């Protein structure tokens, strides 16, 4: 009789264990996120940041990033217009390329100075207009809006490149070192 009771108790206990639901999986951490207070992702880029700026000089928008993974040594930002290559036979237009932004940074201010090397060690390369720094958007109207893509790369290294680096040079140097990527897109054509 003792054997039967003990077996029944053990089986009841095992059944309770078998019916205990598994712990839920941990929530996935959101990926690297790039934002700006200047416009919503996918929204219209204000003239201030374009070749249609009232002052005649476009300024770069403030950019902020969150959800940075561990192990980031530096960041790179590439701003380009892929619609140019889709609509014509020319390559996409590079509007801005800045790299070796310190891994501790979480934003760039509005109006980054147009100089090759910034005080924090960041390096700005030549844009499509063959000038250092940010070049505002200039898609002509009438016509469809162009989509301007800001790509933020979190890297596990600094790039051994100077301001004469091309977009191809930067992409090659980043190969195998990209920890995370965030994207922000805006639309524009001249009024």
Each model region followed by its residue ranges:
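Sec-dependent N-terminal signal peptides
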Residues: 4-13
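N-terminus-centered regions that define maturation/targeting leaders and the start
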Residues: 19-191
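Sec/Tat signal peptide C-region and signal peptidase I cleavage site
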Residues: 14-18
């Amino acid at each position: 009789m003792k054997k039967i009771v003990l077996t029944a108790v053990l089986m009841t206990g095992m059944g309770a264990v078998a019916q205990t639901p598994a712990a839920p999986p941990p929530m996935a951490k959101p990926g690297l996120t790039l934002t700006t207070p200047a416009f919503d992702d996918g929204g219209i880029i204000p003239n201030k940041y374009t070749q249609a700026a009232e002052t005649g000089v476009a300024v770069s928008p403030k950019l902020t990033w969150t959800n940075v993974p561990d192990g980031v040594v530096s960041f790179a930002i590439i701003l380009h217009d892929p619609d140019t290559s889709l609509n014509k036979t020319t390559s996409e237009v590079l509007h801005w390329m800045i790299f070796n932004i310190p891994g501790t940074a979480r934003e760039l201010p509005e109006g980054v100075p147009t100089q090759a090397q910034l005080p924090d060690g960041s390096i700005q390369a030549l844009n499509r207009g063959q000038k250092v720094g940010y070049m505002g958007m200039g898609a002509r109207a009438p016509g469809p809006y162009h989509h301007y893509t800001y790509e933020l790369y979190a890297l596990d290294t600094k790039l051994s490149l100077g301001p004469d680096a091309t977009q191809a040079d930067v992409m090659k140097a980043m190969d195998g070192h990209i920890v995370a990527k965030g994207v922000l897109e805006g639309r524009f054509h001249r009024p």
